[in-house]
Amino acid sequence: MTAIETGAGSSHADRMDRMYRTQRHVYDLTRKYYLFGRDTLINELNVPAGGSVLEVGCGTGRNLALISQRFPDARLFGLDISAEMLASAEAKLGKPRLTRTVLRVADATDFQASEFGETGFDRIVISYALSMIPDWEKAVGAAIAALNPGGSLHIADFGQQERLPRLFRRGLQAWLRRFHVTPRKTMAAVLKSNADRFGDTLEFRPIGRGYAWLFTYRRAAR
């Protein structure tokens, strides 16, 4: 059955709960207009039969529901620091055909696969979450550490809008700051540094003239 477990508490968690206490009810409806690349990321997961998928910062469960439809044999897991958002995820994922989902209130910067009863995950998804996590580099490290050998980390997030007009870029980033969102300039460099360190590989693809960035980080088979 779908289950929610608790295990996180911080000022960041409190801030996210306050922000999403009411927003969570309209989150999916509004975000589809500017969180681009999420469906592309899901379609490219190529989850092995019976494989495990963790979404870090799973929010309302929108992506996990689509992953279940696209890969019906996958075992699904989700974590989020906001208990408010996970309440929406539980409602969305608590349907009979989505009962293989385990949800946990947890900090993206400090989690382990063993907390979910797993030794590692075949796929990890982080969709538009790193731009909201203060210690986002630590979250990247935790996700990489939680991958199975041969597994992959899939990231979609705001880019630097590097090929879009400067006025648009400045306006968008000012608007995003109102919601505690900061596009990470060094995300590609941080991921590449980790890949070089561990002998892994990284694929980087900007979309929408740099509006968003997609990454696929592949762990080497050990």
Provide a role label for each language-model segment.
Residues T2-N46, R62-L66, F168-A174:
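Conserved class I S-adenosyl-L-methionine
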Residues F215-R222:
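C-terminal lobe and adjacent flexible extensions of AdoMet/dcAdoMet transferase-like proteins
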Residues T30, H154-W213:
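C-terminal alpha-helical "lid/dimerization" subdomain adjacent to the S-adenosyl-L-methionine
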Residues E137-P149:
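A short glycine-rich, Lys/Arg-flanked "PGG" loop and its adjoining helix->strand segment in the class I
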Residues G50, L147-S152:
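Short glycine-dipeptide loop
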Residues D122-D135:
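A short SAM/SAH-binding and catalytic strip from SAM-dependent methyltransferases
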Residues T109, A113-I124:
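A short acidic, Gly/Pro-enriched loop at the edge of an enzyme's catalytic core
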Residues L54, T60-F111:
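Class I SAM-dependent methyltransferase SAM/SAH-binding core
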